[in-house]
Amino acid sequence: MRTIFMGTPDFSVPFIEAIARSTHNLNLVVTQPDRRKGRGKELQPPPAKRKAEELGIDVFQPESIHNNYAYQILSDIEPHLIVTAAYGQILPRKILDLPRIKAINVHASLLPEYRGAAPIHRAVMDGKEQTGVTIMEMCDKMDAGDILNYESVDIGKTDTTGDVYKQIITVGPQLLIETMDLLEKNQVTPLKQDENQVSYAPKLKKEDEYLDFSKYTNTEVFNRVRGLNPWPGAFTKFEGKRLKIWETKVHNSSSFNSNSKPGEIIEINQQGPVVKCCQGSVILTKIQPSGKKAMTGEQFIRGYDIKSGIQLE
């Protein structure tokens, strides 16, 4: 089948590789324009472009997918399928209607759960034990199209977003090719999403990164730290500076007095400082002070002379 793939970040790369290895034709990769990044503000190509060029696949980088020129470029290919994976622009109806078979999307959750931009982060932050990959037919509403195929992925008790991401990009490309093969044979029965089961995974905001110990229980802090690892990272404030928290352990200390406040270091454990939450406490086991490399909780205690009674802001 003639296929147009649309994607931009690292997440899209394994799907490009999978289609290129398959029996289907990958005729064009559509991705976002090169952007200026880094201290030198040099133009950087998106990962999808780098991979496509490495594989000798044509690349198209429209500033907007909504203009007539973009439509004509895609239309000239006469695609059987359009496949998207983290492209970064909403596709207009006339492009969704272009392929002879379908326009399909790879989404990193078990739809209808976690529609939106940050499904892996949100699932881990919420303490879910399972998520997955869904291949869905695209429609006018975000992530609301019919389900064509899916596969579950378990989330371990200590898994981070990074750990789950690795599982998703292992399972997802295989699932995509399986779905493309079935679509070619007309052997897919679309399944409508249950609108009563919908939940959302909005894009992360700066305030999501802040650990408010007065707001979150020890389990919630533990899950948020996992969900924000390796990017963008959870943080609190120590001596007025940002303190990144990369790993914690749930802890229920009985040693603090009733006057201690959430965010207060109430105990010095051999694994790290123990911080009071609105319910229970956590041990900070991997920490990164501002301007420093990440360190163990024990190293933080020794290097910064940490004692009970210090308040994290």
From Swiss-Prot:
Single GO molecular function: methionyl-tRNA formyltransferase activity
InterPro entries the UniProt entry points to: Fmt, Formyl_trans_C, Formyl_transf_N, Formyl_transf_N_sf, Formyl_transferase-like_C_sf, GART_AS, Met-tRNA-FMT_C, Met-tRNA-FMT_N
Sequence positions that bind (6S)-5,6,7,8-tetrahydrofolate: S109, L110, L111, P112
Catalysed conversion reaction: L-methionyl-tRNA(fMet) + (6R)-10-formyltetrahydrofolate = N-formyl-L-methionyl-tRNA(fMet) + (6S)-5,6,7,8-tetrahydrofolate + H(+)
Region (Disordered): 32-51
Any one of the GO CC terms: cytosol
Superkingdom classification of source: Bacteria
Keywords recorded for this protein, A-Z: Protein biosynthesis, Transferase
Cited Gene3D superfamilies: 3.40.50.12230
Top enzyme class: transferase
A Pfam family assignment: Formyl_trans_N
PROSITE patterns, per database record: GART (PS00373)
Entry's EC annotation: 2.1.2.9
Family: Belongs to the Fmt family.
Function: Attaches a formyl group to the free amino group of methionyl-tRNA(fMet). The formyl group appears to play a dual role in the initiator identity of N-formylmethionyl-tRNA by promoting its recognition by IF2 and preventing the misappropriation of this tRNA by the elongation apparatus.
Record's protein name: Methionyl-tRNA formyltransferase
Species annotation: Natranaerobius thermophilus (strain ATCC BAA-1301 / DSM 18059 / JW/NM-WN-LF)
Gene name for this UniProt entry: fmt
